[in-house]
């Protein structure tokens, strides 16, 4: 429906239509992989690919929502072009947060969720699967630090950018909450409820991060053209 609406409407630009088409392709792939997941008896690596596609779909939807709900209303523009340095920083931010999600799915997939019963470290336990579990924690910690760096840089340099400030505050707050929830989950003996909340907040972190990236890219790109 989204693809048909985008293609038939004159309200959407070429880029938005392309994103809608990519979203459609990803949804089809996700459906096919969903069947493969069942047929392979929930092989963890297939679920990992399935999750990656699902997160890509979410990212595309955030871009479309941004283009329709915000960019079309002409938000505050930054009166300078987007530099290569910021392009690298924002791209790396997206990759780092994506790695947090994928590493978390990897931990769940190999059954390593509850192997580390202490926080923030895993005691003196080493080797597989303890190292995989700790890798997820290290990546999450690095993501918090790097997101904090990007957020501080954006807010300091572009203090007049309302949407930029709101988006980075949301992303930073959510990833901080996510790490706290991870600790509570360990102390709460890996309650199914806490694990569900942990997963839900992880999705919100991804959405908020994509919003940070597209809001910054969108403002600069429109101004520099």
What are these regions (language model features)?
Residues 1-225:
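Polytopic transmembrane helical bundles with strong interfacial aromatic enrichment
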């Amino acid at each position: 429906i989204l693809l048909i609406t985008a293609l038939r409407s004159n309200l959407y630009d070429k880029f938005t239509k392309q994103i809608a088409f990519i979203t459609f392709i990803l949804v089809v792939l996700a459906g096919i992989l969903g069947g493969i997941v069942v047929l392979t008896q929930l092989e963890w690596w297939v679920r990992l690919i399935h999750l990656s596609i699902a997160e890509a779909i979410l990212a595309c939807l955030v871009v479309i929502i941004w283009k329709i709900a915000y960019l079309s209303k002409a938000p505050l523009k930054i009166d300078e072009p987007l530099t290569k340095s910021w392009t690298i920083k924002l791209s790396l931010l997206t990759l780092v947060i994506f790695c947090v999600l994928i590493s978390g799915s990897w931990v769940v997939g190999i059954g390593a969720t509850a192997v580390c019963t202490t926080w923030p470290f895993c005691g003196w336990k080493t080797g597989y699967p303890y190292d995989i579990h700790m890798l997820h924690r290290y990546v999450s910690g690095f993501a918090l630090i790097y997101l904090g760096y990007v957020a501080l840089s954006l807010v300091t340099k572009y203090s007049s950018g309302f949407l930029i400030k709101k988006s980075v505050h949301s992303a930073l707050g959510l990833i901080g909450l996510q790490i706290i929830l991870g600790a509570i989950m360990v102390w709460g003996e890996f309650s199914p409820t806490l694990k569900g909340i942990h997963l839900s907040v992880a999705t919100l972190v991804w959405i908020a991060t994509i919003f940070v990236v597209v809001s910054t890219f969108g403002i600069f790109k429109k101004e520099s053209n």
